[in-house]
């Protein structure tokens, strides 16, 4: 129910925010002679907001602080509206208004502390409600703390209300400090137009460094061990579909291989490269490329690989289309599509047209496309199964369990026209995918149609 709770809370907040903002815009609308200036300023405000979110925020924030600030700003606006409205309950300052503030604040601090202490690695749905209530309480507490509140608190000497207000203000300040400190637990952090990336250091009980984790948003995209830096970890361990696809490929036994990868991460699959092999990565995010190439000093899979490494910056599909237009078909023996495990799904890489492009870049019928469908919120495997059926491909799903936090749970779908899936090791590890009710209920994604909502895991 975690995903369901998050969706309900987020949509509820969005509804409240839209009602407050649009309601105030409608209330403040001037008479006809000033409408031109009114709509001009309204348009300028929308443009300014877009510029702030798209350009300024990624430049000045290392994480998505504009979202938190937006929640607080909406709550502050709501308080100011209630203060100014003579008919509101806040304008009248009814007795007992702030009595439960301290208790409420402490209750709201609990989920924040659990996330900060990494007892909870994923924020609960309460986090959004926390930020909203925080924005509501801060101006009220400041007002009580520095003005003494309404006259009835001074006339009746309800000093406990002022004490509660000051105490709550202090607690809220601590909460803000915890929020800021929670974003400083990472060894390295950077944000650009494509999102926020971070590197986290893992230590054991004896404070010996164990591994570096690469995170994009809230999702781990790669792990490299400190004591065995050439060991593939995270989603590419010994029982993963990626490893099985690479090591059981007959071409590996007779000569060099050409391996392509849509999505670089930290380049973990390069650890399987041998002398003479070519591993070609397509990556759109320059920050990810810098980390994978070792420019920050955390990851070295690309540097340590015996294979020849090629990194193509830019959108993978556009790059592959440009190569095809030039007649430069890559003839991959194995093509990895590993761009679907994060917080957002690049839909254009999972369409019917995209699959046709991938197939055109394969070496032959025995080549294989390996799709990483590991995702805690979205069932991507049904889309891949539908594409396999559309193009007459054999498909098998290989899942590997989480082991010790270093080798993460992974789900890979192997697609081929040849006999690779008949190899006993793959048959033992995989589950052949056939048309089922999930595929039947979903249309094949195309460049003109996609529907992520139908793939959400509501559990």
Predicted regions mapped to residue ranges:
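Alpha-helical transmembrane segments of multi-pass membrane proteins
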Residues: 1-433, 447-459
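ABC-family ATPase nucleotide-binding domain "signature/switch" substructure
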Residues: 292, 438, 442
């Amino acid at each position: 129910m975690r995903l369901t709770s998050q969706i309900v809370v987020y949509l509820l907040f969005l509804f409240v925010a839209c009602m407050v903002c649009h309601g105030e815009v409608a209330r403040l609308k001037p008479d006809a002679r000033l409408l031109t200036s009114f709509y001009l300023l309204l348009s300028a405000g929308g443009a300014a907001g877009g510029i702030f979110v798209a350009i300024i925020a990624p430049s000045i924030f290392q994480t998505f602080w504009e979202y938190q600030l937006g929640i607080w700003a909406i709550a502050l606006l709501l308080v100011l509206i209630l203060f100014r409205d003579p008919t509101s309950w806040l304008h009248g300052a009814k007795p007992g208004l702030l009595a439960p503030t301290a208790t409420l604040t402490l209750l709201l601090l609990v989920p924040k502390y659990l996330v900060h202490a990494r007892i909870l690695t994923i924020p609960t749905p309460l986090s959004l409600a926390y930020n909203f209530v925080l924005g509501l309480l801060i101006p009220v507490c400041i007002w009580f703390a520095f003005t003494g509140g309404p006259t009835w608190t001074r006339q009746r000497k309800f000093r406990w209300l002022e004490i509660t207000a000051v105490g709550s203000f202090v607690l809220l300040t601590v909460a803000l400090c915890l929020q800021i400190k929670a974003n400083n637990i990472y060894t390295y952090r950077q944000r650009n137009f494509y999102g926020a990336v971070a590197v986290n250091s893992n230590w054991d009980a004896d404070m010996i460094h164990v591994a570096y984790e690469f995170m994009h948003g809230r999702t781990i995209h790669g792990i490299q061990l400190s004591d065995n830096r050439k060991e593939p970890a995270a989603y590419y361990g010994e029982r993963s579909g990626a490893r099985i696809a690479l090591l059981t490929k007959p071409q590996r036994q007779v000569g060099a291989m050409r391996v392509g990868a849509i999505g670089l991460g930290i380049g973990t699959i390069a650890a399987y490269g041998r002398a003479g092999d070519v591993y070609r990565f397509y990556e759109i995010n320059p920050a990810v490329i810098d980390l994978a190439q070792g420019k920050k000093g955390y990851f070295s899979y690309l540097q340590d690989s015996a294979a020849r490494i090629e990194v193509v910056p830019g959108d993978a599909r556009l790059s592959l289309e440009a190569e095809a237009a030039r007649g430069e078909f890559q003839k991959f023996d194995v093509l990895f599509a590993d761009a679907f495990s994060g917080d957002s799904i690049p839909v254009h890489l999972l369409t019917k047209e995209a699959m046709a492009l991938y197939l055109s870049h394969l070496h032959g019928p025995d080549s294989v496309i390996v799709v990483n469908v590991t995702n805690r919120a979205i069932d991507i495997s049904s889309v891949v199964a539908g594409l396999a059926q559309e193009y007459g491909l054999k498909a098998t799903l290989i899942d590997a369990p989480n082991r010790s936090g270093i080798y993460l749970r992974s789900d890979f779908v192997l697609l081929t026209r040849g006999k690779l899936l008949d190899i006993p090791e793959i048959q033992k590890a995989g589950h052949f995918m056939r048309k089922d009710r999930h595929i039947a209920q979903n249309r094949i994604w195309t460049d003109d149609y996609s529907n992520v909502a139908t793939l959400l895991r509501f559990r």
